Amino acid sequence: MLVIYGAGVIDMSKIRSALEVALERSADVKVDRKAVSEEKFVRRGKTSAGRFLSDGDDDAVGREIKTLSGEERGWFKKGLSANLLANIILPRSEEDLERLDLIGRGLKRMAKDAGAARNLEYLMNRYGEVFRQYLDTIRNLESQLRAQWDGRLRQKEEQLRQQIGQTVSLTVEQDPEFRKVLSEKLAELDSQYSEILDRGKAELRKLL
């Protein structure tokens, strides 16, 4: 439809098309607003997790969850759980086991119900057992490798003494081959336990 206006001609179909485009953009903006809101509460959840890992106040976490409802609570818990679960990693020391207990307390605050809370506590206890086994395996592995390398190092020391006429003391830490073999063995071990770790996290998510 054409409308004559003054000296010009206006194509009304183009105006309608422009209006339709504007409405579509308006709809897109509404979707973006929801995405922005989700990002806001997910980020808030991650921040809360970081604060909890520093101060250990799981009561504060529980109170913050209760102040939210609906999608906002879901988004907040999404960020909170993501950060806490990301901190469940294979331990390198006994201190890391204490951190696992802390994470368990935080996750328990997000459990769907009492039954889920009990299952979550059980899974976290299993994690503790697996992690202690992992640390023991690492210690045994390193001890066995050191014993194997001890004879080799003594032979190298004797060869060097004959070559340079001086006594040389070597340690496994100085041997690149030892470090390489130990690193490879640890990588294999990490791969095996990481599979257990990932399966456990998947089960934990179902309880939150």
Task: List where the protein language model places each region.
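Short, Lys/Arg-enriched N-terminal segments with co-localized hydrophobic residues
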Residues: 1-11
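Leu/Val/Ala/Ile-rich N-terminal alpha-helices, chiefly Sec-type signal peptides and the beginnings
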Residues: 11-70
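Long amphipathic alpha-helical segments with strong coiled-coil/leucine-zipper propensity
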Residues: 49-145
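Long amphipathic alpha-helical coiled-coil rod/stalk domains
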Residues: 126, 130-133, 137, 141, ...
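An amphipathic alpha-helical core segment
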Residues: 139-172
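Alpha-helical oligomerization segments
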Residues: 166-208
